[in-house]
């Protein structure tokens, strides 16, 4: 008996010695929208949970994720250290709670515990109001919006590049001419945005001298706009790093202060030269700091989602460096309007945006709008859009009420307070006119968006890449070399210029809505 007891005790001791300790469970580090966030756009399409390590979640556990009050969960995607819950159908002024239940999220270590429950709540924005019902403290932004009106983006042109070398014609467009801009004015456009990529047209440190011939050509094109009586915007465009090694690398700057200081020095040097070249031009010329600064993930990378304020704060610093450089050149640059974008030019990240300090007090906020993506520029290319569109033929969300809410947020928080806001890019892939249904919804979308922009005091710049035909990436309206209409674009351009320029009290956003294509 004694021997048996000793054997049993020895066996228990060995079991305790051989027992493995479970690895620590994955720990939640961040959620977007942030817990307790208010004013969240009803267009918000995802809730992202970030953990301290790479994680996984089974299909069965994905189905256990809940959102209360109930809305549609379109998909759940685990990638690296994040879980993205794609949603649609949020309502105004509603508090939602999203829960990933205990045990659903697991790591990849052996003998590892599952994660604890992850829960977050946020409240959506209030329902949109007509812009006139908010107190308008200043007419400055409204007046500038009227002056800029409907603008034209000369896309895939001076922003085109091969490798690291910018070239006006490398992406297939002919060199622009004075006729291009003269005919734009005749078509009803009031302004042009001239995206410019600089890349290796910038010399080495410390001078960063810009190639004279390239700057001369930019100045010549700006002169075309001046001669045509158009407002013009000039920027730095594809210098941003989109996983391609370009110099405006916000990810590198966000993790290395020395890199950030080096990039800011180059920003100041580049913009000092550009601004100096144009310091005698009138207020019809606007300088825009950047295009769509982001880390290659368009706001969805693990690095960004872990703490969006980190990269957004870097962009805020870069925008300030731009303003300081331009103002220091003097002349008309001391007081001209300057434009600065949100992160990725995405309106959804405006809460992280800080307007640069400006002694002249003449700053403009820029964002881009290609919503809904699956209708405008994505692969799906749905045929329908809006309240009369047929389910299954249109993208989820981003109907008429979405645009009213989105635009009104900028009107209420900026425009009515005297801070101009402009939609630096918008548009939709051309549709085939022979498909009468698709053509009708295409025209309706562009008319509604432009009329909404007009209603809420936002000038809007149509993206035109010069690509003929119809379908994805076909955004050709005006021949860049001649200014002539492309294909069936005149019908669409006339609709948009009328939406922006027609001030008749009988032509309103409501009358456009009422004329939506019949299902």
Language-model features and meaning:
Residues 8-11:
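C-terminal motif of bacterial Sec signal peptides marking the signal peptidase cleavage site
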Residues 19-37, 92, 102-128:
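Acidic, Ser/Thr/Gly/Pro-rich low-complexity segments and short DxT(G/T)-type signature motifs
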Residues 43-76, 103-106:
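Short, surface-exposed alpha-helix to beta-strand junction/turn motifs within ectodomains of secreted
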Residues 127-191:
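N-terminal carbohydrate-binding accessory modules
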Residues 154-176, 204-210, 374-402:
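Acidic/histidine-rich helix-loop elements
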Residues 172-191, 209-236, 242-289, 316-330:
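An active-site-proximal structural segment forming one wall of the substrate-binding cleft
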Residues 261-399, 405-428, 455-458:
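Active-site region of glycoside hydrolase catalytic domains
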Residues 433-519:
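Aromatic-rich peripheral "rim/lid" segments of glycoside hydrolase catalytic domains that contact
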